[in-house]
Design a protein with these regions (language model features):
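Hydrophobic beta-strand scaffold residues
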Residues: 48, 74-75, 109, 115
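C-terminal interaction surface of TIR/SEFIR-family domains
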Residues: 128-217
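Cross-kingdom TIR/SEFIR domain
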Residues: 85-154
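TIR-domain catalytic/interaction hotspot
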Residues: 53-96, 108
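Conserved N-terminal substructure of TIR/SEFIR domains
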Residues: 1-71, 191-218
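Conserved beta-strand segments of the P-loop GTPase G domain that flank and frequently precede/overlap
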Residues: 23, 51, 77, 118-119
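Surface-exposed alpha-helical segments enriched in charged/polar residues
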Residues: 39-42, 66-69, 100, 104, ...
């Protein structure tokens, strides 16, 4: 996939245009939607990036902000901002915090950075995060197909415009590959650095097989 690099006023690299910062919860119940986001983004010729793929030697906050700065787009899923089951019950603030960093970067760093909010239920974000009033979240209803539908809505202006049916085909093959990745890495979780990179790599290959316009740009 071709990579376009934008250079800022100071001469330093601002973002890579085909990379998307993916801000999602890292838990097993979210795995079907995790795979759907990867399949959907790769179907548009984009490359998902996430905090979990960056070496732990760097400070976490620095890693997050560095990734956001290098991405033209960021996707933020707020569907799991809820109390966890571990005592004491604590709300999960990572996703809205990372969304805040992306909004700040758009406001004072690079106005061309596009950020999108995803949720499972309509109107819930307006209640839990009222500062977002005026921003319409993309409602996926907690379903992989819903994720794919909303990804196509969010990216309607992109050069590549795969159909939901084409994205579902990519997802179907990626789910099979995910089973093999778990087996090869001897892990039960896909939320690891190596597993994430393998998923993105495989999804990119699958996408080029199914989306004709992607083959024309490679």
């Amino acid at each position: 996939m071709p990579t376009a690099i934008k250079t800022g006023r100071n001469g330093k690299t601002s973002y890579v245009s085909d990379k998307v910062f993916l801000n999602i919860p890292y838990d097993e119940k979210f795995e079907p939607l995790y795979l759907a986001f990867i399949a959907g983004l790769c179907g548009f010729g984009l490359i998902p990036v996430a905090v979990l793929e960056i070496p732990e030697s760097e400070r976490r906050l620095d890693r997050i902000f560095s990734l956001i700065r290098r991405c033209k787009i960021s996707f933020h899923d707020l569907s799991r901002v809820e109390l966890d089951r571990k005592r004491p019950p604590t709300p999960r603030f990572n996703m809205p915090f990372e969304l805040g960093l992306a909004v700040a970067w758009h406001r004072i760093g690079d106005a061309s950075h596009d950020w999108y909010v995803f949720e499972a239920k309509a109107h819930r974000v307006q209640k839990s995060l009222s500062d977002l009033n005026g921003t319409e979240p993309y409602i996926h209803r907690g379903k992989p197909r819903g994720v794919l539908q909303q990804v196509t809505n969010a990216l309607i202006r992109r050069r590549h415009r795969p159909s939901v049916i084409e994205l579902e085909a990519i997802l179907g093959h990626l789910k099979k590959a995910a089973v093999e990745i778990k087996r090869e890495l001897r892990t039960k979780s896909l939320f690891g650095s190596r597993a994430f990179k393998d998923l993105v790599y495989v999804a990119g290959i699958i996408a080029r097989k199914h989306i004709a316009s992607l083959r024309q740009t490679t």
